[in-house]
From Swiss-Prot:
It comes from Oryza sativa subsp. japonica (Rice). The gene is DRM1B. One of its GO terms (molecular function) is DNA binding. One of its GO terms (cellular component) is nucleus. CDD domains: UBA_atDRM2_like. This is Probable inactive DNA (cytosine-5)-methyltransferase DRM1B. The lineage of its organism: Eukaryota, Viridiplantae, Streptophyta, Embryophyta, Tracheophyta.
Length: 437
Protein backbone atom coordinates (compact mmCIF):
# COMPACT_ATOMS: atom_id res chain seq x y z
CA UNK A 1 0.00 0.00 0.00
CA UNK A 2 1.23 3.48 -0.82
CA UNK A 3 0.15 6.72 0.79
CA UNK A 4 1.04 10.33 0.18
CA UNK A 5 2.90 12.27 2.83
CA UNK A 6 2.28 15.91 3.67
CA UNK A 7 5.09 16.84 1.32
CA UNK A 8 3.42 15.07 -1.61
CA UNK A 9 5.90 12.18 -1.65
CA UNK A 10 4.55 8.69 -2.23
CA UNK A 11 5.40 6.32 0.62
CA UNK A 12 4.94 2.60 1.08
CA UNK A 13 3.79 0.87 4.25
CA UNK A 14 7.29 1.04 5.70
CA UNK A 15 7.45 4.78 5.38
CA UNK A 16 9.84 4.75 2.46
CA UNK A 17 9.58 7.20 -0.39
CA UNK A 18 8.62 5.34 -3.57
CA UNK A 19 9.62 2.19 -1.74
CA UNK A 20 13.29 3.08 -1.80
CA UNK A 21 14.29 5.51 0.93
CA UNK A 22 12.92 6.91 4.21
CA UNK A 23 10.48 9.68 3.41
CA UNK A 24 11.88 11.89 6.16
CA UNK A 25 15.27 11.81 4.49
CA UNK A 26 13.83 12.66 1.08
CA UNK A 27 11.67 15.43 2.50
CA UNK A 28 14.64 16.88 4.33
CA UNK A 29 16.72 17.25 1.17
CA UNK A 30 13.73 18.62 -0.73
CA UNK A 31 13.40 21.21 2.00
CA UNK A 32 17.00 22.24 1.42
CA UNK A 33 16.12 23.31 -2.11
CA UNK A 34 17.22 20.31 -4.18
CA UNK A 35 14.80 19.20 -6.86
CA UNK A 36 12.85 15.98 -6.37
CA UNK A 37 14.34 14.53 -9.55
CA UNK A 38 17.87 15.20 -8.30
CA UNK A 39 17.21 13.65 -4.89
CA UNK A 40 15.75 10.47 -6.38
CA UNK A 41 18.60 10.33 -8.87
CA UNK A 42 21.08 10.36 -5.99
CA UNK A 43 19.13 7.62 -4.23
CA UNK A 44 19.05 5.58 -7.42
CA UNK A 45 22.82 5.81 -7.83
CA UNK A 46 23.44 4.69 -4.26
CA UNK A 47 21.18 1.71 -4.88
CA UNK A 48 17.64 0.52 -4.48
CA UNK A 49 18.24 -3.03 -3.29
CA UNK A 50 15.78 -3.66 -0.48
CA UNK A 51 18.05 -6.31 1.00
CA UNK A 52 20.85 -3.78 1.26
CA UNK A 53 18.74 -1.42 3.43
CA UNK A 54 20.70 1.44 1.93
CA UNK A 55 23.68 1.53 4.28
CA UNK A 56 24.90 4.71 2.67
CA UNK A 57 21.58 6.46 3.09
CA UNK A 58 21.15 5.20 6.62
CA UNK A 59 24.46 6.80 7.45
CA UNK A 60 22.83 10.10 6.56
CA UNK A 61 20.06 9.75 9.11
CA UNK A 62 22.12 11.01 12.08
CA UNK A 63 22.39 14.31 10.27
CA UNK A 64 18.69 14.86 10.74
CA UNK A 65 19.46 15.27 14.42
CA UNK A 66 22.55 17.36 13.76
CA UNK A 67 25.16 14.68 14.54
CA UNK A 68 26.99 14.64 11.19
CA UNK A 69 28.92 17.16 9.10
CA UNK A 70 26.69 18.48 6.32
CA UNK A 71 29.50 18.65 3.77
CA UNK A 72 29.78 14.87 3.58
CA UNK A 73 26.04 14.49 3.12
CA UNK A 74 25.54 17.14 0.48
CA UNK A 75 28.55 16.22 -1.62
CA UNK A 76 26.68 13.90 -3.97
CA UNK A 77 23.75 16.26 -4.48
CA UNK A 78 26.02 19.24 -5.05
CA UNK A 79 27.98 17.23 -7.60
CA UNK A 80 24.74 16.51 -9.47
CA UNK A 81 23.88 20.18 -9.35
CA UNK A 82 27.21 21.12 -10.94
CA UNK A 83 26.88 18.43 -13.61
CA UNK A 84 23.39 19.58 -14.53
CA UNK A 85 24.66 23.14 -14.93
CA UNK A 86 27.42 21.86 -17.23
CA UNK A 87 24.85 19.93 -19.28
CA UNK A 88 22.80 23.09 -19.68
CA UNK A 89 25.87 25.00 -20.88
CA UNK A 90 26.63 22.28 -23.43
CA UNK A 91 23.06 22.45 -24.74
CA UNK A 92 23.40 26.21 -25.18
CA UNK A 93 26.67 25.76 -27.02
CA UNK A 94 25.02 23.52 -29.54
CA UNK A 95 21.84 25.39 -30.28
CA UNK A 96 20.20 28.21 -28.41
CA UNK A 97 16.85 26.98 -29.75
CA UNK A 98 17.38 23.55 -28.19
CA UNK A 99 16.90 21.85 -31.56
CA UNK A 100 20.08 19.77 -31.32
CA UNK A 101 20.49 17.38 -28.41
CA UNK A 102 23.61 17.12 -26.34
CA UNK A 103 26.02 14.61 -27.94
CA UNK A 104 27.15 12.89 -24.78
CA UNK A 105 23.60 12.45 -23.62
CA UNK A 106 22.62 10.85 -26.92
CA UNK A 107 25.66 8.61 -26.96
CA UNK A 108 25.34 7.20 -23.50
CA UNK A 109 21.56 7.12 -23.02
CA UNK A 110 20.53 3.70 -24.24
CA UNK A 111 17.31 3.23 -22.30
CA UNK A 112 18.68 0.41 -20.17
CA UNK A 113 16.93 -0.68 -17.02
CA UNK A 114 17.67 0.20 -13.45
CA UNK A 115 19.86 -2.85 -12.92
CA UNK A 116 22.13 -1.99 -15.84
CA UNK A 117 22.14 1.63 -14.79
CA UNK A 118 23.25 0.80 -11.26
CA UNK A 119 25.92 -1.60 -12.44
CA UNK A 120 27.27 0.98 -14.87
CA UNK A 121 27.32 3.71 -12.22
CA UNK A 122 29.09 1.38 -9.78
CA UNK A 123 31.83 0.63 -12.31
CA UNK A 124 32.13 4.29 -13.13
CA UNK A 125 32.42 5.23 -9.46
CA UNK A 126 35.18 2.66 -8.91
CA UNK A 127 37.23 4.05 -11.78
CA UNK A 128 36.67 7.61 -10.65
CA UNK A 129 37.82 6.66 -7.15
CA UNK A 130 40.92 4.98 -8.58
CA UNK A 131 41.84 8.06 -10.60
CA UNK A 132 41.15 10.41 -7.70
CA UNK A 133 43.34 8.27 -5.43
CA UNK A 134 46.14 8.77 -7.96
CA UNK A 135 45.81 12.52 -7.54
CA UNK A 136 43.65 13.45 -10.52
CA UNK A 137 40.73 15.90 -10.12
CA UNK A 138 37.32 14.23 -10.12
CA UNK A 139 36.01 16.33 -13.01
CA UNK A 140 38.99 15.29 -15.16
CA UNK A 141 38.37 11.65 -14.28
CA UNK A 142 34.71 11.90 -15.33
CA UNK A 143 35.61 13.57 -18.62
CA UNK A 144 38.20 10.88 -19.34
CA UNK A 145 35.61 8.13 -18.82
CA UNK A 146 33.21 9.99 -21.11
CA UNK A 147 35.88 10.20 -23.81
CA UNK A 148 37.23 6.65 -23.60
CA UNK A 149 34.19 4.69 -22.47
CA UNK A 150 33.35 2.90 -19.26
CA UNK A 151 35.28 -0.24 -20.21
CA UNK A 152 38.55 1.61 -20.85
CA UNK A 153 41.50 0.59 -18.70
CA UNK A 154 42.84 2.91 -16.01
CA UNK A 155 46.08 3.27 -17.98
CA UNK A 156 44.16 4.53 -20.99
CA UNK A 157 42.15 6.92 -18.82
CA UNK A 158 45.37 8.33 -17.35
CA UNK A 159 46.76 8.92 -20.82
CA UNK A 160 43.51 10.47 -21.98
CA UNK A 161 43.57 12.97 -19.11
CA UNK A 162 47.00 14.12 -20.16
CA UNK A 163 46.38 14.12 -23.91
CA UNK A 164 46.98 17.62 -25.26
CA UNK A 165 43.88 19.78 -25.55
CA UNK A 166 44.97 20.44 -29.11
CA UNK A 167 47.57 18.34 -30.86
CA UNK A 168 50.95 20.04 -30.95
CA UNK A 169 50.60 21.72 -27.57
CA UNK A 170 52.18 20.32 -24.42
CA UNK A 171 49.75 19.94 -21.56
CA UNK A 172 50.66 19.47 -17.93
CA UNK A 173 48.35 18.80 -15.05
CA UNK A 174 47.65 21.43 -12.40
CA UNK A 175 48.16 19.07 -9.50
CA UNK A 176 50.43 19.85 -6.58
CA UNK A 177 51.32 16.14 -6.48
CA UNK A 178 53.44 16.73 -9.56
CA UNK A 179 56.56 18.73 -8.94
CA UNK A 180 59.04 20.69 -11.03
CA UNK A 181 62.41 19.15 -10.28
CA UNK A 182 65.67 20.68 -11.45
CA UNK A 183 68.83 18.60 -11.51
CA UNK A 184 72.42 19.78 -11.37
CA UNK A 185 74.37 18.71 -14.46
CA UNK A 186 77.20 17.63 -12.17
CA UNK A 187 75.10 15.09 -10.32
CA UNK A 188 74.53 17.40 -7.38
CA UNK A 189 71.57 17.52 -5.07
CA UNK A 190 68.15 18.02 -6.62
CA UNK A 191 66.17 21.18 -6.03
CA UNK A 192 62.46 20.61 -5.81
CA UNK A 193 59.81 23.27 -6.11
CA UNK A 194 56.20 22.52 -5.32
CA UNK A 195 53.66 24.30 -7.47
CA UNK A 196 50.19 25.00 -6.11
CA UNK A 197 48.06 23.17 -8.63
CA UNK A 198 44.87 25.04 -7.79
CA UNK A 199 46.30 28.53 -8.25
CA UNK A 200 49.23 28.36 -10.67
CA UNK A 201 49.87 26.88 -14.07
CA UNK A 202 52.52 24.24 -14.16
CA UNK A 203 55.86 25.63 -15.34
CA UNK A 204 57.64 23.90 -18.16
CA UNK A 205 60.65 21.86 -17.31
CA UNK A 206 63.79 23.77 -18.33
CA UNK A 207 66.55 21.74 -16.74
CA UNK A 208 69.57 20.06 -18.28
CA UNK A 209 69.00 17.29 -20.89
CA UNK A 210 67.37 14.20 -19.45
CA UNK A 211 70.34 11.89 -20.10
CA UNK A 212 72.41 13.76 -17.47
CA UNK A 213 69.99 13.14 -14.62
CA UNK A 214 71.32 11.61 -11.45
CA UNK A 215 70.15 8.02 -10.85
CA UNK A 216 67.36 7.19 -8.44
CA UNK A 217 68.42 5.31 -5.35
CA UNK A 218 64.93 4.53 -4.11
CA UNK A 219 65.27 6.83 -1.08
CA UNK A 220 62.42 9.07 -2.19
CA UNK A 221 59.16 8.96 -4.11
CA UNK A 222 59.44 12.24 -5.98
CA UNK A 223 58.11 12.31 -9.55
CA UNK A 224 60.49 12.34 -12.47
CA UNK A 225 60.60 15.56 -14.48
CA UNK A 226 59.43 15.40 -18.07
CA UNK A 227 61.46 17.06 -20.81
CA UNK A 228 60.03 19.63 -23.16
CA UNK A 229 60.11 18.89 -26.01
CA UNK A 230 59.59 15.19 -25.33
CA UNK A 231 61.92 13.86 -28.03
CA UNK A 232 63.81 11.15 -26.17
CA UNK A 233 67.58 10.86 -26.41
CA UNK A 234 67.64 11.75 -30.08
CA UNK A 235 65.50 12.27 -33.15
CA UNK A 236 66.27 10.79 -36.56
CA UNK A 237 68.92 12.83 -38.43
CA UNK A 238 69.42 15.05 -35.38
CA UNK A 239 73.08 15.99 -35.62
CA UNK A 240 72.82 18.99 -33.31
CA UNK A 241 73.17 17.10 -30.04
CA UNK A 242 75.83 14.79 -28.73
CA UNK A 243 74.03 12.36 -26.45
CA UNK A 244 75.71 10.17 -23.87
CA UNK A 245 74.43 8.29 -20.85
CA UNK A 246 76.15 6.12 -18.27
CA UNK A 247 74.63 2.73 -17.47
CA UNK A 248 75.54 0.55 -14.47
CA UNK A 249 78.11 -2.11 -15.33
CA UNK A 250 75.62 -4.94 -14.76
CA UNK A 251 73.18 -3.33 -17.24
CA UNK A 252 75.68 -2.97 -20.08
CA UNK A 253 75.25 -5.16 -23.13
CA UNK A 254 73.01 -8.20 -23.58
CA UNK A 255 70.63 -9.42 -22.43
CA UNK A 256 68.76 -6.32 -23.57
CA UNK A 257 65.43 -5.31 -22.06
CA UNK A 258 62.83 -2.75 -23.11
CA UNK A 259 59.99 -1.53 -20.86
CA UNK A 260 57.24 0.86 -22.01
CA UNK A 261 54.51 2.74 -20.12
CA UNK A 262 52.55 5.99 -20.28
CA UNK A 263 54.84 8.96 -19.68
CA UNK A 264 52.52 10.89 -17.41
CA UNK A 265 51.98 8.17 -14.86
CA UNK A 266 50.95 9.03 -11.27
CA UNK A 267 53.52 10.24 -8.79
CA UNK A 268 56.09 7.63 -7.82
CA UNK A 269 55.33 5.12 -10.60
CA UNK A 270 58.36 5.82 -12.77
CA UNK A 271 60.60 6.07 -9.72
CA UNK A 272 59.53 2.61 -8.62
CA UNK A 273 59.93 1.11 -12.09
CA UNK A 274 63.37 2.66 -12.47
CA UNK A 275 64.43 1.31 -9.09
CA UNK A 276 63.77 -2.26 -10.21
CA UNK A 277 65.55 -1.75 -13.55
CA UNK A 278 69.03 -0.73 -12.39
CA UNK A 279 67.99 2.89 -11.68
CA UNK A 280 68.05 3.61 -15.41
CA UNK A 281 66.41 6.91 -16.27
CA UNK A 282 63.48 6.60 -18.74
CA UNK A 283 63.58 7.90 -22.27
CA UNK A 284 60.42 10.00 -22.69
CA UNK A 285 59.06 10.37 -26.21
CA UNK A 286 55.92 11.88 -27.74
CA UNK A 287 55.01 10.09 -30.95
CA UNK A 288 53.87 13.35 -32.53
CA UNK A 289 57.50 13.82 -33.59
CA UNK A 290 57.30 10.55 -35.54
CA UNK A 291 53.73 10.40 -36.85
CA UNK A 292 50.44 12.32 -37.06
CA UNK A 293 49.17 11.25 -33.61
CA UNK A 294 50.35 12.43 -30.19
CA UNK A 295 51.17 9.65 -27.74
CA UNK A 296 53.39 10.35 -24.72
CA UNK A 297 55.36 7.30 -23.61
CA UNK A 298 58.32 6.46 -21.42
CA UNK A 299 60.86 3.71 -22.11
CA UNK A 300 63.40 2.13 -19.77
CA UNK A 301 65.96 0.09 -21.67
CA UNK A 302 69.65 -0.72 -21.90
CA UNK A 303 69.84 -0.49 -25.69
CA UNK A 304 72.68 1.53 -27.21
CA UNK A 305 71.61 5.04 -28.17
CA UNK A 306 74.47 5.83 -30.56
CA UNK A 307 74.16 5.47 -34.33
CA UNK A 308 70.39 5.41 -34.44
CA UNK A 309 68.97 5.79 -37.93
CA UNK A 310 65.44 6.44 -39.25
CA UNK A 311 63.44 3.50 -40.55
CA UNK A 312 61.98 3.78 -44.03
CA UNK A 313 59.39 4.59 -45.11
CA UNK A 314 59.11 7.60 -42.82
CA UNK A 315 55.47 7.93 -41.66
CA UNK A 316 53.54 11.17 -42.33
CA UNK A 317 53.59 13.70 -39.52
CA UNK A 318 50.35 15.58 -40.24
CA UNK A 319 46.74 14.59 -40.87
CA UNK A 320 46.74 16.06 -44.38
CA UNK A 321 49.89 14.09 -45.29
CA UNK A 322 48.42 10.87 -43.90
CA UNK A 323 44.96 11.31 -45.46
CA UNK A 324 45.18 13.72 -48.44
CA UNK A 325 41.56 13.10 -49.42
CA UNK A 326 40.39 14.97 -46.33
CA UNK A 327 41.89 18.28 -47.48
CA UNK A 328 38.99 19.24 -49.74
CA UNK A 329 36.48 18.80 -46.92
CA UNK A 330 38.51 20.19 -44.02
CA UNK A 331 36.89 23.44 -42.76
CA UNK A 332 39.05 26.50 -42.17
CA UNK A 333 37.91 26.72 -38.54
CA UNK A 334 39.37 23.28 -37.71
CA UNK A 335 43.08 23.99 -36.99
CA UNK A 336 44.08 20.41 -36.17
CA UNK A 337 47.25 19.16 -37.83
CA UNK A 338 47.69 16.04 -35.67
CA UNK A 339 45.44 13.69 -33.75
CA UNK A 340 45.28 13.35 -30.00
CA UNK A 341 46.19 10.00 -28.45
CA UNK A 342 44.40 7.15 -30.24
CA UNK A 343 41.65 5.58 -28.15
CA UNK A 344 40.21 2.08 -27.95
CA UNK A 345 36.68 3.50 -28.20
CA UNK A 346 35.31 5.49 -31.12
CA UNK A 347 32.28 7.69 -31.65
CA UNK A 348 29.06 5.95 -32.64
CA UNK A 349 27.31 6.42 -35.98
CA UNK A 350 24.53 8.29 -34.19
CA UNK A 351 27.13 10.63 -32.75
CA UNK A 352 28.65 11.58 -36.12
CA UNK A 353 25.18 11.87 -37.66
CA UNK A 354 24.18 14.45 -35.06
CA UNK A 355 27.26 16.48 -35.95
CA UNK A 356 26.23 16.38 -39.61
CA UNK A 357 22.70 17.51 -38.78
CA UNK A 358 23.95 20.34 -36.58
CA UNK A 359 26.26 21.63 -39.32
CA UNK A 360 23.65 21.20 -42.05
CA UNK A 361 21.09 23.22 -40.14
CA UNK A 362 23.22 26.36 -40.12
CA UNK A 363 24.83 26.00 -43.54
CA UNK A 364 27.67 28.43 -44.21
CA UNK A 365 26.58 30.77 -41.39
CA UNK A 366 27.88 28.53 -38.62
CA UNK A 367 27.75 30.28 -35.21
CA UNK A 368 31.06 30.37 -33.28
CA UNK A 369 29.48 28.44 -30.40
CA UNK A 370 28.58 25.55 -32.72
CA UNK A 371 32.04 25.63 -34.29
CA UNK A 372 33.61 25.37 -30.86
CA UNK A 373 31.39 22.46 -29.82
CA UNK A 374 31.95 20.52 -33.04
CA UNK A 375 35.70 21.09 -32.85
CA UNK A 376 35.73 19.82 -29.28
CA UNK A 377 33.98 16.63 -30.40
CA UNK A 378 36.41 16.19 -33.30
CA UNK A 379 39.36 16.46 -30.95
CA UNK A 380 37.79 14.16 -28.39
CA UNK A 381 37.06 11.37 -30.88
CA UNK A 382 39.83 12.03 -33.46
CA UNK A 383 37.27 12.57 -36.21
CA UNK A 384 38.22 13.33 -39.82
CA UNK A 385 36.28 15.21 -42.49
CA UNK A 386 35.14 12.88 -45.27
CA UNK A 387 32.43 14.97 -46.93
CA UNK A 388 30.54 18.23 -46.68
CA UNK A 389 29.53 18.60 -43.02
CA UNK A 390 30.41 14.93 -42.59
CA UNK A 391 32.90 13.48 -40.11
CA UNK A 392 33.99 9.89 -39.54
CA UNK A 393 36.05 7.91 -37.06
CA UNK A 394 39.41 6.38 -37.87
CA UNK A 395 39.26 2.80 -39.08
CA UNK A 396 41.66 0.17 -37.64
CA UNK A 397 43.66 0.04 -40.89
CA UNK A 398 44.07 3.83 -40.76
CA UNK A 399 45.37 3.58 -37.20
CA UNK A 400 47.74 0.84 -38.37
CA UNK A 401 49.06 3.21 -41.00
CA UNK A 402 49.51 6.08 -38.53
CA UNK A 403 51.45 3.91 -36.07
CA UNK A 404 53.67 2.30 -38.68
CA UNK A 405 52.08 -1.15 -38.90
CA UNK A 406 51.48 -3.00 -42.19
CA UNK A 407 47.96 -3.02 -43.56
CA UNK A 408 45.66 -5.67 -42.02
CA UNK A 409 48.16 -6.25 -39.20
CA UNK A 410 45.29 -6.64 -36.69
CA UNK A 411 42.63 -7.97 -39.04
CA UNK A 412 40.71 -11.02 -37.88
CA UNK A 413 39.81 -9.96 -34.35
CA UNK A 414 37.15 -7.63 -32.97
CA UNK A 415 37.34 -3.93 -33.74
CA UNK A 416 38.03 -3.07 -30.12
CA UNK A 417 40.79 -5.65 -29.96
CA UNK A 418 42.18 -4.32 -33.25
CA UNK A 419 42.77 -0.93 -31.68
CA UNK A 420 44.08 -2.31 -28.39
CA UNK A 421 46.77 -4.23 -30.28
CA UNK A 422 48.10 -0.94 -31.64
CA UNK A 423 49.31 0.31 -28.27
CA UNK A 424 52.96 0.71 -29.29
CA UNK A 425 54.37 2.81 -32.12
CA UNK A 426 56.29 0.36 -34.29
CA UNK A 427 58.47 2.97 -36.01
CA UNK A 428 59.63 4.30 -32.65
CA UNK A 429 60.64 0.84 -31.44
CA UNK A 430 62.41 0.21 -34.73
CA UNK A 431 64.32 3.48 -34.29
CA UNK A 432 65.41 2.49 -30.78
CA UNK A 433 66.66 -0.90 -31.99
CA UNK A 434 68.51 0.25 -35.13
CA UNK A 435 71.66 0.73 -33.07
CA UNK A 436 71.82 -3.06 -32.65
CA UNK A 437 72.08 -3.65 -36.40
Amino acid sequence: MRIASSSGILMDANGKANGSAPSALVAYFLGMGFSREMVFRAIKEIGNDNNNTFPHLLQLLPFLSGDTDSEQILELLLTYQILEEEDEEEDVNWDEDDTVDNFDRATYSDGSGDEDFLQEMSEKDEKIKSLVSMGFPEDEAMRAITRCGLDASVDLLVESIYAPASAGNVYFTNLSDYEDTEFSSFGGRKKTKLIDGTKKKRERYRSRPQWNQVPFDGSHEEPMPLPNPMVGFSLPNDGLRSVHRNLPDHALGPPFFYYENVALAPKGVWTTISRFLYDIYPEFVDSKYFCAAARKRGYIHNLPIENRSPVLPIPPKTISEAFPSTKMWWPSWDPRRQFNCLQTYVASAKHTERIRCALGRFGDALPPAVQKSVLEECRKWNLVWVGKNKVATLEPDEMEFLLGYPRNHTRGVSRKRDIELLGIHSKLIQLHTTSLC
